[in-house]
Amino acid sequence: MKEKIPFYNEKEFNEMMKKTKKGTFSGWYIINPENKSVEFSGNFNRQFKLNKPVIPVNTEYVTRKEFNEYKDSNDQRLTKIENKVDKLEVKVDKLEEKVDKLEAKVDKLEEKVDKLEAKVDKLEEKVDKLEAKVDSGFEMLAKILAAINKRLDSIEGRLDKIEPPK
């Protein structure tokens, strides 16, 4: 089983080894000068573990080459993703322009519709006025026809009273 037991520096590791002469370590360790830590991978005997309690991490040893390959593949994936995002940004910008143009067209069409509605309203008013005039004209014609019918009836009555010549 491979375990990683971190120490903050090489001095701490050496002091730990002096304190625990019973403990042994077989494996490797890397000193990282950037964050001043030491990484270990290997086998520690039980006595060493008792004197330096840590939570064991079940990991596999990864070489620098494998790590760099993994990092490169991740960089390539990130580059592809960034390129796709850039392309999508361009497409979104184009779509935004199209939407703006369409909004302008819709505004123009709304103005035209408003104008046409105003014209239709005016025409409806004119039609209502004409209907009123036609209705009043029909009423007048009906009155005139009624008057003419009365006159015809009276004329027929007079004609009936007149005796035809013999």
Swiss-Prot record:
Gene3D superfamilies to which the protein is assigned, alphabetical: 1.20.5.170
SUPFAM superfamilies: MPN010-like
Domain of life: Bacteria
Disulphide bridges: none
Family designation: Belongs to the UPF0134 family.
Protein name from the UniProt record: UPF0134 protein MPN_138
Organism: Mycoplasma pneumoniae (strain ATCC 29342 / M129 / Subtype 1)
